[in-house]
């Protein structure tokens, strides 16, 4: 009989890949953007605008908020189409940073001066999840805000527009 211990299998450390981490952050950003707009009154639509980010990333593609062409009766407004490189969809705000319910009937509703024009795109959050009674379930994701880049952080419940 040998006194040598049996060889054991090496345990490999399983760390999330870069793609996995990126994918997770995209989902978090999308949820936060859509949730903020739903709270502001655009139940199944997301109030968004195009924006160039310092990183040069195209968040319109990254966060799956791609605009869709819709007929005038199918939704609040027409989509301007696909965004170019370094452009992003971002929650757009009125003077207080909230989506403007009055703009629901307008395509490219004007926002605050210098902010640009907003469009309305279909949200992927179910209507039930956007209702006031379910807001508490989304508030639990608040710690994710610290992980997001500056422009995506919320100030007093609304998106910063700077």
From Swiss-Prot:
Residues 13-23 have a biased composition (Polar residues). One of its GO terms (molecular function) is structural molecule activity. The keyword Secreted does not apply. GO terms for cellular component: host cell perinuclear region of cytoplasm; viral capsid. GO terms for biological process: viral translational frameshifting. Residues 1-23 are annotated as: Disordered. Keywords: Host cytoplasm. The keyword Membrane does not apply. It is found in: Host cytoplasm; Host cytoplasm, Host perinuclear region. This protein is very unstable. This is F protein. It comes from Hepatitis C virus genotype 1a (isolate 1) (HCV).
